[in-house]
């Protein structure tokens, strides 16, 4: 058994020699003999045959070597196939991860850029809206002051009309008293007050009346009284009409201001709400940009890690493939050597005498 193992080890070492199919048995043995292990195995084989050892035992050993090499190759093929499947799965996952990070980077870059553009537009618009609010408030203040001035003017003029109408009514009463026969001396005090009030107004409308009343103070006659009463009635009617016109103007201006102020207030509300919306949007835009920049940095790092992992896996796979191919090639060469030795033993060295003859021819 020990002898068989020794021969097996020597033959296995010899099997690593690389030969070509066109070589003759002499050439094969010559190449084997150049190696120390080859020389030893040839010596053992020669001794084996010289002492009558069976050639079949050597054939069995060579068959065992070939079987071992084929078995090792099958195991290597199986491991290689399993590693290839696992590698392809890892590569597919990494490529998918890389594609995901690349997509995220593009999306985040677009988000950052579009949000930055939107931020710039919002900042410009908020300045415009702020200016519009200031203009709106100024317009409201100016128009409100104008309206207040209009109202104050109406109040003043309406009060003047009331005073004037009261003076006309008082003058009518005095004239009617004179017409009824009351002495002027009894009405003088009232007459002078009315006359003074009418003169204070400095209204052209009252000038004929003032002149008529002045004449009446010096001479009272029925004809003059009738003319004065008619004049008083006309003046009062004009005052009533003028007062009504002023009131109509006041009401129209008040209604217009109510509409205008409502529009200004609505515009102010809209502008304030728009400004608040824009300011809130600006805050959100800045947050979004910051988050996008941070996420972009993270995704870039993740992409670099995934690409590094892919490169490492590809290098590992290339090394494994190279090692597998080298080992496969080595086994194929070893099997070829074993097959050549088997061919020599089977076809050329079937008898001990023939082997010894070839041995002597070679060496």
Curated annotation (Swiss-Prot):
GO cellular component: trichocyst
Keywords per UniProt: Coiled coil, Signal
Record localization: Trichocyst
Coiled coil: 85-119, 244-352
Maturation-removed propeptide residues: 18-52, 190-221
Top-rank lineage group of the source organism: Eukaryota
Bilayer-crossing regions: none
Chief place of localization: other
Post-translational modification: Two components are produced by post-translational processing from the precursor peptide.
UniProt keyword Coiled coil present: yes
Signal peptide bounds: 1-17
Function: Structural protein that crystallize inside the trichocyst matrix.
Protein family: Belongs to the TMP family.
Protein name: Trichocyst matrix protein T4-A
Organism: Paramecium tetraurelia
